[in-house]
Amino acid sequence: IKTLTVLATTPPQLADDAFSGVDVRNIKLTVPKGSKKAYKNAPNWNRFFKSPKNVTEQCPDEYAIIPIPESAVYQPGKTLSTKKLGKIVAPASLANEQERLKEVLGNRLGIKNFNKGKHPIVLAIDESIGKKEAYKLTIDEEGINITGADATGVFYGIMTLDQMLIPEQENSKLAYLNAVTIEDKPRTKMRELMVDPCRIFIPYEDLKGMVVEMARYKMNALHLHLTDD
């Protein structure tokens, strides 16, 4: 999200957890003329006007992952330093997934060099781990392993890692990841998001952006509600 436009002259009530995990200070808030001061002083809306801070923090004891994985086994007391990540090991068949992982590490941790790093991130395919789109993600003191039953499973494992790297405090970076083994697979064949351009016009570029976010949450079908007739 780069721009948020609000048409109300009086700031609507905004829940404390609204925009959770999103650095709203990097989003341009557009409001009606003459109402900027009201939004600047309104609870939770005022976060859009605060200056970003560079803060490093440790991850929570357990990760908030959507959808909740089928299994997550933690290793209390064991962590992995994110400062020593960077090197990616992957076969040529996972070149697309490797590029997506680079984007995740760049966006979440600011990593630019993917040829260095004491602790590697290994991508692999193992059909024996489960049905299509299943994956296993392991984080320990030596690095990160993401194994999928197929390339889609590897991609979904990367999307889970992406959520795990979201810090609790906005505009910060996680210093450590807690050791964990996550095993997951789709509960249903179709995971659908419905949008309603029947009642409100949605620009094509906005729809494309929705597809990107759908992938983050492992959804695979976009339902366009065009008419009630």
Predicted ranges, named:
Residues 1, 25, 189, 218-220:
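Short loop/turn motifs at secondary-structure junctions
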Residues 1-55:
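Solvent-exposed loop and capping/linker segments of extracellular ligand-binding repeat ectodomains
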Residues 4, 29, 193, 222-224:
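Hydrophobic residues within beta-strands of alpha/beta enzymes
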Residues 35-36, 151-153, 200, 228-229:
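Solvent-exposed loop/turn segments at secondary-structure junctions
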Residues 37-40, 96-98, 130-132, 200-203:
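Short, solvent-exposed loop/turn elements at domain surfaces
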Residues 55-189:
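Acidic, contiguous N-terminal accessory segments
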Residues 180-202, 209, 215-217:
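An acidic-aromatic substrate-binding cleft motif
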Residues 217-229:
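Aromatic-lined carbohydrate-binding/catalytic grooves of carbohydrate-active enzymes
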